[in-house]
């Protein structure tokens, strides 16, 4: 039986002033529902998820030691989201630490260090090989010069949704990497969008509680992205029954950031209610 509440979603999206891309998938039935799935959006921090997958793939191949520690020079620091630029200069982090910071706190400096290590060209080749045909990395995080030149990072709801759907099934690269990416995403601190109006397992819960939620709870592995008048969130949801579904919702050219955030919150809520009915 189809669970995705399409009519309610169309009604809600019709009230949103701005652009939207939406992907919803039900792992149990294979049903996929999209709205403007191939519409390009500035990726914001969503692009950090496939970058994490590539880092883990490189580590599995023996090309990177995740335990190796590095420090980020002060002259390479950028602002925006994250914590590293507020810490003592010269502090060292392992690549393992960097990847957690990149996702859970959306740390731009951790992300840029990982991009430098992997290489932009190789990252884009990985995206193409992984089937992310509309996802491109043209600059590092908060690269003001690149932005002034018109270079930006792009993706679509379908690229991000299919990526997470593949991971939810344990099929992205392999089951180990799929689960490792989701385990990092389950530690997410930013939960004001997709998880906000549903009984999500809290971010401070143990990993086991997040992987096997109690009755009445839902585990969420999500990653947000935002710029002024642009609000995104993507996530894998797991009910206590074990049933999984995916939502990737991207918005831009909004009347207000609140409108985008509120729309994401409400889409997530009506999808959750439908899957629990």
Identify what each model region corresponds to.
Residues 61-87:
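Short, glycine/proline-biased beta-turn/loop segments that scaffold the active-site neighborhood
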Residues 5-20, 25, 87-89, 96-99, ...:
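Penicillin-recognizing serine hydrolase domain
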Residues 52-56, 112, 161:
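Short, hydrophobic alpha-helix immediately C-terminal to the catalytic nucleophile
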Residues 30, 42-70, 102, 247:
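Active-site SXXK
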Residues 37-41, 85-88:
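Short glycine-enriched, charge-decorated loop/helix-capping segments at active-site entrances
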Residues 18-40:
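Short, conserved catalytic-motif segment at the N-terminal edge
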Residues 98-106:
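Short helix- or helix-capping micro-motifs
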């Amino acid at each position: 039986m189809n669970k995705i509440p399409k009519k309610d979603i169309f009604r809600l999206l019709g009230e949103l002033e701005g652009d939207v891309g939406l992907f919803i998938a039900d792992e149990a039935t294979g049903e996929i529902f999209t709205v403007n799935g191939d519409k390009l959006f500035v990726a914001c921090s969503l692009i950090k998820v496939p970058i994490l997958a590539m880092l883990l793939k490189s580590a599995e191949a023996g090309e990177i030691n995740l335990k190796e520690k590095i420090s980020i020079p002060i002259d390479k620091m950028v602002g925006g989201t994250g914590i590293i630029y507020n810490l003592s200069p010269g502090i060292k982090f392992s690549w393992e630490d960097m990847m957690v910071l990149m996702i859970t706190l959306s740390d731009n400096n951790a992300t840029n260090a990982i991009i430098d290590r992997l290489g932009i060209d190789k990252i884009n080749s990985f995206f193409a090989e992984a089937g992310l045909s509309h996802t491109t990395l043209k600059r590092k995080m908060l690269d003001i010069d690149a932005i002034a030149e018109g270079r930006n990072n792009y993706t679509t709801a379908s690229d991000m949704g299919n990526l997470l759907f593949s991971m939810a099934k344990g099929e992205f690269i392999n089951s180990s990497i799929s689960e490792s990416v989701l385990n990092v995403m389950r530690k997410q601190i930013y939960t004001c969008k997709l998880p906000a109006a549903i009984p999500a397992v809290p971010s401070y819960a143990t990993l086991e509680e997040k992987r096997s939620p109690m009755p009445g709870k839902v585990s969420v592995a999500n990653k947000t992205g935002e710029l002024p008048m642009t609000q995104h969130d993507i996530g894998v949801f797991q009910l206590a029954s074990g049933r999984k579904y995916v939502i990737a919702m991207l918005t831009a050219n909004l009347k207000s950031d609140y409108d985008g955030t509120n729309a994401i919150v409400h889409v997530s809520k009506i999808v959750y209610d439908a899957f629990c009915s």
